[in-house]
């Protein structure tokens, strides 16, 4: 079994059951092993070798899993570091290495935007929004962040309660 198949199997193992408080240590161990495994990916930066699309896709997914796990653990530092590691996969590597993925990445960008707002980092929030195109800003995960920011700017805190109910538990 090659290293890519091993990574795919570990990702499948991670996703086989929902992350909960009861299996948190097991999921953390799997993720740690996945992060170590991605170090063996020969084409990831700062390598000068030709990029291998499968390695980039798996590395992106490992960082997304880490973001999800850090949300559950309420570890803000790990969440931010995970986002900063996955961000190039969303905005930089799509030029010639990774195909433009579905809107799945907007889920993670939206979480990060909420993180920035919750830490009163409105300048960073605005900077991140500028990376998105107009179509992306209409996505529900991005729109809720923009609506919350608008309520904060206007001082309209009564509308924040209305925005509180979202379809996703991480939001």
Which residues does each predicted region cover?
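Eukaryotic basic, amphipathic alpha-helical target segments in cytosolic regions
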Residues: 15-22, 35-38, 42-46, 75, ...
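Alpha-helical scaffold segments of alpha-solenoid architecture
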Residues: 83-171
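Internal amphipathic alpha-helical repeat/solenoid segments
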Residues: 1-62, 66
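Alpha-helix boundary/capping segments in eukaryotic regulatory proteins
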Residues: 51-58, 71-81, 97-101
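"A position-specific structural signal for the A-helix of alpha-solenoid helical repeats
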Residues: 9-12, 58-61, 65, 69-72, ...
